[in-house]
């Protein structure tokens, strides 16, 4: 892979689903929606995705987070207008709370069918939507030190974005069930902690020779370098509101630039043992903003919210320079309000059907949450749809 290197520009990709206004279930109408966009807004940047119920908004390359977010804001408003025209709603969260994976249709693209042929059951489970943030990095020599340092902030970003507590009508007890689903694919999950670009090239050569890349197109690691000269974070759940997306993107942008400048100044970047990174990923997926995370190689721990608060202070001067000070401060607004996963649970519980966390609803196995009827989570879908609409 070539890595041209670039200034610390930013770009954002935002996946959203389409739901029926009456049933609140997913509907495979992405092609119809994009056709409407073609009519009304020719030249738009909305694209189809793996499933026929999904579209993705793609920002251009921008210098600042406000510019990239405004790009998405315009696209989202146009998309919502066209969705209204054809009678569907936009839904932005990590997973849908009650849709069944077996009912979903693939988009019409040969490579998608090939992926399903290879991944089978787990490939069909991918009813998931996320936010991808690209940040430019100056040279390939810096890429893997920066990615390894970013992995120490995996739980921070995941906890902020977590918005997928339910699956097929089940309260999973997790804050981000999307995280557990996506890592089942053979080329997904956490990247290996490569020491340099040469090791990354050797890895890709092995994947090419073994046919892995031929089957999947590329590696889909949670964080990865791209041919555009960027480092891409891919593990955040899609958020219910645009300002949340902006806060997460600002935090990511500031971190990458902060780490690159530390490298330029001759400092060694922080890393965690791979087993600590894996544990932090699980804790954030499970507990969201209530997670107690491992903060250093000595296995000290802190609440993820305390860590976020401290890092917002540390990154504040840089955020002023990068033009995203307000967006970074919204990290604290998100913490104070609570995560999307908690709001979805509260909406479902308010309508009387979602079990309280810790309730044993099937035998005495102690599993948190429990099985319930899909109607229990209609309120959560309504909350998600309404929150997105109001945030635009």
Curated annotation (Swiss-Prot):
GO biological processes: modified amino acid biosynthetic process
Function according to Swiss-Prot or TrEMBL: ATP-dependent carboxylate-amine ligase which exhibits weak glutamate--cysteine ligase activity.
The species this protein was found in: Corynebacterium jeikeium (strain K411)
Keywords recorded for this protein, A-Z: ATP-binding, Ligase, Nucleotide-binding
HAMAP family: Glu_cys_ligase_2
UniProt-listed Enzyme Commission number(s): 6.3.2.2
Protein name: Putative glutamate--cysteine ligase 2
Gene3D superfamilies named in the record: 3.30.590.20
PANTHER family on file: GLUTAMATE--CYSTEINE LIGASE 2-RELATED (PTHR36510:SF1)
Keyword Ligase part of the UniProt annotation: yes
Gene Ontology terms, MF aspect: ATP binding; glutamate-cysteine ligase activity
Top class in the EC scheme: ligase
Residues covered by region (Disordered): 347-367
